[in-house]
Amino acid sequence: MPDEAQPLTAAKPESASASAAKPAPSAPQAKNDTHGPIQHAPAAPVDKPAEQQPRPKPLPAERPQNAPVVRAPAGQPARSGSSNRVRARLARLGVQRANPYNPVLEPLLRIVRGNDPKIETSTLRQIERAYQVAERWHRGQKRKSGDPYITHPLAVTTILAELGMDPATLMAGLLHDTVEDTEYGLEDLRRDFGDVVTLLVDGVTKLDKVKFGEAAQAETVRKMVVAMAKDPRVLVIKLADRLHNMRTMRYLKREKQEKKARETLEIYAPLAHRLGMNTIKWELEDLAFAILYPKMYDEIVRLVAERAPKRDEYLAVVTDEVQQDLRAARIKATVTGRPKHYYSVYQKMIVRGRDFAEIYDLVGIRVLVDTVRDCYAALGTVHARWNPVPGRFKDYIAMPKFNMYQSLHTTVIGPGGKPVELQIRTFDMHRRAEYGIAAHWKYKQEAVAGASKVRTDAPKSSGKSKDDHLNDMAWLRQLLDWQKETEDPGEFLESLRFDLSRNEVFVFTPKGDVIALPAGATPVDFAYAVHTEVGHRTIGARVNGRLVPLESTLDNGDLVEVFTSKAAGAGPSRDWLGFVKSPRARNKIRAWFSKERRDEAIEQGKDAIVRAMRKQNLPIQRILTGDSLVTLAHEMRYSDISALYAAIGEGHVSAPNIVQKLVQALGGEEAATEEIDESVPPSRGRGRKRRANADPGVVVKGVEDVWVKLARCCTPVPGDPIIGFVTRGSGVSVHRSDCVNVDSLSREPERILEVEWAPTQSSVFLVAIQVEALDRSRLLSDVTRVLSDQHVNILSAAVQTSRDRVATSRFTFEMGDPKHLGHVLKAVRGVEGVYDVYRVTSARRPS
């Protein structure tokens, strides 16, 4: 591992010039990445020829090329002492005026100076040189937005500066895409900027080549850490890179946006959490949430904005009372409200199963103090005013979290009997909680600069130096141990399982590779994780050198070896299905047995469907040959109808359940039964009289006094394109032109009639709507009340709630004027928690 304190190797001016002499790419290139225009970075500079770019500041021994030569008057001896010092200062000032910093870098350099007021000018010049090299080699490259590509590395570096990262990391941020996207190589980089910057850029370049996704396994993580994260700053740069990409995602196609957002939510946000970088984590989560679930996101944003004024008023009262108590106790503290993050609110609704109001109305405040002693003193002061809620106190100072997060958590019954959450910690703890591992370099720079704002957990009288305090940071030592323990990936993965769930175990293969398995996994799960054939042929196992039964439970760090059979007929046992834990093993075992009897299972499944349909007098032939079953199979994620039949035959899905779904797709039991008549050829001489007071609002062109009815499968309303179909004994059934049943009906074109809308005051139409909302108590009651207020007659209502606390409701009601439907939908959308509402029809999906 390179020493972080190692000074940067400054390249000589002629070396940088030699680098500039290399031919830069001539043709403009549009990178296929997630980059769009930056939001917080300055505009890209105007391109300059290499020879016009500012020169690095000359060494003290050099005379600047354009600096004035100060000479003593003739006949007088040269003055010394203060006069010479004044002249030298003026000469240096002339150099600075002659070589100002690139104005594009001023916002970045302002942040850098704020982090370290005593930073040397030579270091700032090195950062400027890194920008010059990056701008030169990215010249001509464009982002998806059309902006110069250099705007991206500049924005990434600004994020790194805001985190307080050191100059080497800032230079690596500016140069992080040069090696991958240009002809500027690692040797050029090492010559111009030294080993540390080269190591960081190389690590980020390799990290970019790791492909994450559904197939990402624990060994991929191990390789990433061993080969690419020899220095933790590599991961910090990558997080800043991903954050800027997420901020500028709008120029990509929707499909790619969702892919990147899902990857961010599953990998990068948890990685930031593991590194303790909560500010990055929260923003990544909210950005990904907005892309993946835009309607839910918008609804939570609306709810937050709606409740913010009242919540802020209550928060001000609580904050003021806490400040008064702490002031009376002579505890110097900063008391602020804790922000609520949209994805965090959504997650709490899912995990805790609570309504939005419960979560958002729970006020949280943060108390920051100087020392650990003050933390506990502040806790006592708060508990003296308000009663604590039993079981809600947590001491993360004495027992830090896995990422060394430290704080005191408590919940009290505040003013008005409302619960209030408090976090009490020192300023240093807060910086680590916000910036995580990045806080190490910020702390280090402040310590070196002797900044007065640096606070320590120990009293000033303790006599400890700043270096001692750095050594006391157990959280930092634990995280930096990655670099020393890469040969032991199991231990690393225990502290950095960012892309896998918590309920897992990590075991080793005989070759030292890491396999991630569900908690409670067995050697059989391990065998199938290695390879399907290894799993099928497994006959025994050895764990940590000891023979064990195949159903034994594996623990973290176990070394697992399995024995396989070479016999031609070797295969899995059905008994394994009783103890395997991984979906992969279970699916592979079932697939092995399913292969032998798939045809048999398909026939059994089809027979089961037919029997279930007969019980409900459904049109078997039409449904089995139509699109309804195909659509249902795809919705249930089966590749085709045969796969659905096989699943039914093998007992994975029940036939009555499938038939019920089909009936719902056709518009309900009545509509499905109605279709039986439509599938039978018409016979003359039979008919029914039209029902009185039931004007459908449709007439058949060229035909009078014929019974017309609106199909319940697609519930057409005036304005919808429609067709008529002659049924036996039921007159003409009117369907939407895009109804899923039209394809099967059109096989008999002689029975298709032209119809048109002619609604009257007595016409009544069926409308079905679907309401999607964040689940809460009284949701159904509130929606039905709004529908009643809109004077619609509700005929049926059904509600389902998913695991992620999304309530999906379907209402069928009668309306006299479908033009009023827009007002109805708008009113329902105004119900708290509702983020989408739309009319439901059985329209065919666009091909």
Swiss-Prot record:
**Which positions fall inside the HD domain?**
149-246
Q: Which reaction does it catalyse?
A: GTP + ATP = guanosine 3'-diphosphate 5'-triphosphate + AMP
Any single biological process term in GO: guanosine tetraphosphate biosynthetic process
**EC number(s) in its UniProt entry?**
2.7.6.5
Q: Where is the ACT domain?
A: 768-842
Q: Which PROSITE patterns match?
A: ACT, HD, TGS
Gene name of this polypeptide: relA
- What protein is this chain from? GTP pyrophosphokinase
Q: Where is the composition biased (Low complexity)?
A: 10-31
* Region of interest (Disordered), residue spans: 1-85, 671-694
